[in-house]
Amino acid sequence: MPPLFKGLKQMAKPIAYVSRFSAKRPIHIILFSLIISAFAYLSVIQYYFNGWQLDSNSVFETAPNKDSNTLFQECSHYYRDSSLDGWVSITAHEASELPAPHHYYLLNLNFNSPNETDSIPELANTVFEKDNTKYILQEDLSVSKEISSTDGTKWRLRSDRKSLFDVKTLAYSLYDVFSENVTQADPFDVLIMVTAYLMMFYTIFGLFNDMRKTGSNFWLSASTVVNSASSLFLALYVTQCILGKEVSALTLFEGLPFIVVVVGFKHKIKIAQYALEKFERVGLSKRITTDEIVFESVSEEGGRLIQDHLLCIFAFIGCSMYAHQLKTLTNFCILSAFILIFELILTPTFYSAILALRLEMNVIHRSTIIKQTLEEDGVVPSTARIISKAEKKSVSSFLNLSVVVIIMKLSVILLFVFINFYNFGANWVNDAFNSLYFDKERVSLPDFITSNASENFKEQAIVSVTPLLYYKPIKSYQRIEDMVLLLLRNVSVAIRDRFVSKLVLSALVCSAVINVYLLNAARIHTSYTADQLVKTEVTKKSFTAPVQKASTPVLTNKTVISGSKVKSLSSAQSSSSGPSSSSEEDDSRDIESLDKKIRPLEELEALLSSGNTKQLKNKEVAALVIHGKLPLYALEKKLGDTTRAVAVRRKALSILAEAPVLASDRLPYKNYDYDRVFGACCENVIGYMPLPVGVIGPLVIDGTSYHIPMATTEGCLVASAMRGCKAINAGGGATTVLTKDGMTRGPVVRFPTLKRSGACKIWLDSEEGQNAIKKAFNSTSRFARLQHIQTCLAGDLLFMRFRTTTGDAMGMNMISKGVEYSLKQMVEEYGWEDMEVVSVSGNYCTDKKPAAINWIEGRGKSVVAEATIPGDVVRKVLKSDVSALVELNIAKNLVGSAMAGSVGGFNAHAANLVTAVFLALGQDPAQNVESSNCITLMKEVDGDLRISVSMPSIEVGTIGGGTVLEPQGAMLDLLGVRGPHATAPGTNARQLARIVACAVLAGELSLCAALAAGHLVQSHMTHNRKPAEPTKPNNLDATDINRLKDGSVTCIKS
């Protein structure tokens, strides 16, 4: 239902703040809610199942003499004395009250077995037997539940209530009860109830289906049901146990489906959908925590939640007041109102805590995925751990779970329901079993008793004849049942012990505390991110202060000369923001001790050998480097501080390379996260190179708008591509098609003879060889999957080209590991012992080099992008003509490139756009060589321009490499493709390839239009040239000016 008034959203703020509080402390809220709900649950169960008592007796043990008392009531009792002629039937009460000196019990036992070889046991006190029936006469009512025969067969009395596997019998009894009630009810009422239950089950099914569409797993849907069930039990407890309003089980059975259908789960579904979508949209930007996501979700949907529930609550209260003379209806309306009230309470508490927990699990899972991907892509584990702590992604989908896991989850739930059903309903289940296993009709005295009564029963006597008791041989499943029941019985007895119960309670408390601790530990990244953002903002403000206020003295008197202006080093401080590093603190220590000498080299070497390098000053560490005692590459490991290592390396190189520029700040190095660089992006780091980053867009690609970042130092490039975006959008945007996705690696091997090389090629080309190599290759990674191996021979050299999917990573390192292992398996397992691996990379890939194989076969992502530009847009925006553009494209991009013998270069300047986007997004700039392979086609269609770019070898990734750096990662966030995709690995990288192709499309369109109109040189002169500084007026007279003019003419002629 839409909001009825505008201020409704403000009403949701209180419950939104409650949901944020719950999201920050999910374990506490969940435990507290479940404990309260469990108390209400036990109270309600005790109310409805009044035979079940909350005492210390185990639910698996019966009360003393319970079976004997029940059997005595079911016996047929007969009395005789000397004054009576024959036997008189009496009741059980009379049999227990009459003072007869002798009371005998006649047990009627039947041994029934489908196996005729099973022998019937021999029993004492047998007075009569016929076929499979034995009569036992004894003076006490004791029935053996198990009897053994001479051949070892064990017989069991089937009236034992502890039968977990008699489902068929129980089903029959329930069916009989159900049939009897249905036949007595009105057909129209039955139809309504059946319809209501069908709608209720459909609503529950819709809950799971809708949750699955949002990307949720099974447990979030189940938690929604638990939330509603808790509301039901709390409402029942308040209504019946506190208010004393009785709601019968029949009323609850009839009315509950209508409540479920009317209220439904739509609000919880929308809250979960908003939260999960928000989590995916935020991606890896680290600007929002899980409790903030939950807060926004409840704020968005909370208004409608309050509105719908309050309307229903008022309706039920009004109905209860209007129909107060109908007690059953009134009580049910009160119950329904309380159900909705507790729904309003539990949704921002229990359900929000569950949702926050789910988001936290997504974050943890995302961390694991990123760490594994980075390690497989060649990033050192320490750096991978650093990145995975700050950048996390989730992968979870109910449909992607294995069938075994789903079955196990469902089995746990069904087991829980069955245990409750079995324990709490034990009494009436026992009655149902007895009605089937016992013949409860009144049993007459057998002839062998009545005929010999005068001889055997001369005095007063009572004979109680039991119903027919059935014994059956024990089967294998019953032995399993016995083991299960024995285990449960022992556990139940152990838990009742006063020491064990306290131990279990202590273990529960410890478990809850540990879970809280572990969850808080998993959420450290959230608080860490928030603290870092706050520190960054504070640092930015501090760095905006005027530079003239800096009073810190400099280390040297050297100056930085720029043009004709001279400025001291103190004014050349970097203006980049971020927290100060330990190297700056060490610099201050160096400044304070300028008059102190550096310790002797021998003493420094001793400290280095003892592992105390961190205690040295930067100048002392630099001295060790200068004297060759400490390698440049080992500074990060020895100092344990990447930023300090960069500072020391700059000091040392400024002397070793005689490069005083490194002692200045012209190449910045401060306030940069070198932890992400170490072991992943660069070695011997001395700083970072700032590049200007522009943005083009919005550019509509396949119906979605993107702003595309470009890092470049070429003027007009961003402006030109921006004009292309405007023209493409005017035609409805760009359309893309991805035709291939597979990174390649091409090893080269050698065999002793050409025949062996040829045989190996034939084997690799066969289905057997392909499958064998795929199995070996795929075992090396959870992401890389081998698609195909292409081979070729050159003499005895065999070249192989492995084509592999690599998820969202660019994947060169990932493939190299798989190729290396596959070649090893060929030598060791597949019979190619004489194969010699010449190189893991034989340039048959081909990587970072122009090659026709990449142009023909493709490498990485093969994308075709197309757009239709209306004719009037070509004229007004591009300032050109459709026919002129088509003619220019043919002459320049097709004929001109062919005349130059180009391979993959049938375009105007695809490399310009590809390189600029690669630099901005942390891609490998060297792979611009093959990624820029592109053919641009244009044609006129009904007066409009249709332009397309076909790029068969775009090599990109959204995780690993330069994407781990924060600035580049931020630009990937701008596009919404950072890190691995949550549910479909490879989707983000493929989308990035589409974006790159469309950026090239915009650039091609604009440049070709500029060339066709002759605007290229003019635009570069306008944007790339600064206006000349005005010259000072001279004092030349007219005679001198005329002389200079004549001289210039003479010079030109000569």
UniProtKB/Swiss-Prot annotation:
Protein name as annotated: 3-hydroxy-3-methylglutaryl-coenzyme A reductase 1
GO biological process terms held by the UniProt record: coenzyme A metabolic process; ergosterol biosynthetic process; isoprenoid biosynthetic process
Family in the record: Belongs to the HMG-CoA reductase family.
Cytoplasmic side: 1-28, 209-217, 268-309, 358-400, 520-1054
Membrane association type: Multi-pass membrane protein
Compartments in which it is found: Endoplasmic reticulum membrane; Nucleus envelope
SUPFAM superfamilies per record: NAD-binding domain of HMG-CoA reductase, Substrate-binding domain of HMG-CoA reductase
EC number, as in UniProt: 1.1.1.34
Domain note: The sterol-sensing domain (SSD) is required for sterol pathway signals to stimulate hmg2 ER-associated degradation and detects both geranylgeranyl pyrophosphate and a secondary oxysterol signal.
InterPro entries according to UniProt: HMG-CoA_N_dom, HMG_CoA_Rdtase, HMG_CoA_Rdtase_cat_sf, HMG_CoA_Rdtase_CS, HMG_CoA_Rdtase_eu_arc, HMG_CoA_Rdtase_N, HMG_CoA_Rdtase_NAD(P)-bd_sf, HMG_CoA_Rdtase_sub-bd_dom_sf
Residues recorded with modification Phosphothreonine: T552
Active site residues per record: E714, K848, D924, H1020
Binding residue positions for NADP(+): S781, R782, F783, D808, A809, M810, G811, M812, N813, M814, I815, S816, N1024, R1025
Molecular function terms, GO-annotated: hydroxymethylglutaryl-CoA reductase (NADPH) activity
Pfam families: HMG-CoA_red, HPIH, Sterol-sensing
GO terms under cellular component: endoplasmic reticulum; endoplasmic reticulum membrane; nuclear envelope; nuclear periphery; peroxisomal membrane
Lumenal-facing ranges: 50-187, 239-246, 331-336, 422-498
Gene3D superfamilies: 3-hydroxy-3-methylglutaryl-coenzyme A Reductase, Chain A, domain 2 (3.90.770.10), HMGR, N-terminal domain (1.10.3270.10), Hydroxymethylglutaryl-CoA reductase, class I/II, NAD/NADP-binding domain (3.30.70.420)
Keyword annotations of the record: Endoplasmic reticulum, Glycoprotein, Lipid biosynthesis, Lipid metabolism, Membrane, NADP, Nucleus, Oxidoreductase, Phosphoprotein, Steroid biosynthesis, Steroid metabolism, Sterol biosynthesis, Sterol metabolism, Transmembrane, Transmembrane helix
